């Protein structure tokens, strides 16, 4: 199935070389990663020994963090250069991560009765707002989740506040992200996400908002989901 926006892929292909530069194009993700890893570990009751799928893994920032926490990680993405960066960085750091260039829909289609991979934890971070059909991603994640597994989605709410902070603030004023990284009309309201999850027979256990202080460069979580947010589902 072709659930790909080539324009979106091209954006991330161009930024691949700076993926692991903590002061480069992905600085916000590097700053956010410890918080989201801690949240995932708490809600999943730890990652050690668990089988994890990172959907839209890009250059592997979260994949590596989860592998360091003891998980057996598979990372999938449709980009070429970011995946090469991910493989090289993992190898240089002695980490064994199974990176594959595939859509999650094709990943599901390639499952067989004799070899059906299921995962304890599935993460899909900052990806749904970059694809034509988010519901297809959500349904595919559900198909790969173990019955007692935990699924995490993070995305951006379609509000004026999010437009001002994520696009005007982060891309144009603070220049933390390249201009054009996000498109406002692709942002996803929590009610939309929850409706899609309900259609996929997933139930939201918790939803939290990400918040950022540009002075201290620190992220934190609270109940305000008017901008960036993360949802935990089963």
From Swiss-Prot:
GO terms for molecular function: 2-polyprenyl-6-hydroxyphenol methylase activity; 3-demethylubiquinol 3-O-methyltransferase activity; polyprenyldihydroxybenzoate methyltransferase activity. The keyword Cell membrane does not apply. The keyword Transferase applies. GO terms for biological process: methylation. S-adenosyl-L-methionine binds at residues 36, 56, 77, 125. It comes from Actinobacillus pleuropneumoniae serotype 5b (strain L20). It is an enzyme of class 2 (transferase). Its EC number is 2.1.1.222, 2.1.1.64. The gene is ubiG. Transmembrane segments: none annotated. Keywords: Methyltransferase, S-adenosyl-L-methionine, Transferase, Ubiquinone biosynthesis. Pathway: Cofactor biosynthesis; ubiquinone biosynthesis. Belongs to the methyltransferase superfamily. UbiG/COQ3 family. This is Ubiquinone biosynthesis O-methyltransferase. It holds the Pfam family Methyltransf_23. InterPro entries: SAM-dependent_MTases_sf, UbiG_MeTrfase. O-methyltransferase that catalyzes the 2 O-methylation steps in the ubiquinone biosynthetic pathway. It catalyses: a 3-demethylubiquinol + S-adenosyl-L-methionine = a ubiquinol + S-adenosyl-L-homocysteine + H(+); a 3-(all-trans-polyprenyl)benzene-1,2-diol + S-adenosyl-L-methionine = a 2-methoxy-6-(all-trans-polyprenyl)phenol + S-adenosyl-L-homocysteine + H(+).
């Amino acid at each position: 199935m072709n659930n790909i926006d080539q324009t979106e892929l091209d954006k991330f292909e161009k930024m691949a070389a700076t993926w692991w530069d903590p002061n480069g194009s992905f600085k916000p993700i590097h700053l956010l990663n410890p918080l989201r890893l801690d949240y995932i570990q708490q809600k999943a009751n730890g990652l050690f020994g668990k089988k994890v799928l990172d959907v839209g893994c890009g250059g592997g920032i979260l994949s590596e963090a989860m592998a360091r926490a003891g998980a057996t990680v598979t990372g999938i993405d449709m980009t070429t250069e970011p995946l090469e960066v991910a493989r090289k960085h993992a190898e240089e750091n002695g980490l064994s991560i199974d990176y594959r260039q595939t859509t999650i829909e094709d990943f599901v289609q390639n499952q067989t009765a004799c070899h059906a991979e299921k995962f304890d934890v599935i993460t899909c971070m900052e990806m749904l707002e970059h694809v034509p059909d988010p519901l297809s991603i959500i349904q595919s994640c559900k198909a790969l989740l173990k019955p007692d597994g935990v699924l995490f989605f993070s995305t951006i709410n379609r509000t004026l506040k999010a437009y001002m902070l994520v696009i005007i603030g982060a891309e144009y004023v603070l220049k933390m992200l390249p201009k054009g990284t996000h498109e406002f009309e692709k942002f996803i309201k929590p009610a939309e996400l929850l409706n899609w999850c309900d259609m996929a027979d997933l139930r939201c256990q918790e939803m939290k908002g990400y918040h950022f202080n540009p002075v201290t460069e620190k992220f934190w979580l609270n109940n305000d989901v008017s901008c960036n947010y993360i949802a935990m589902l089963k």
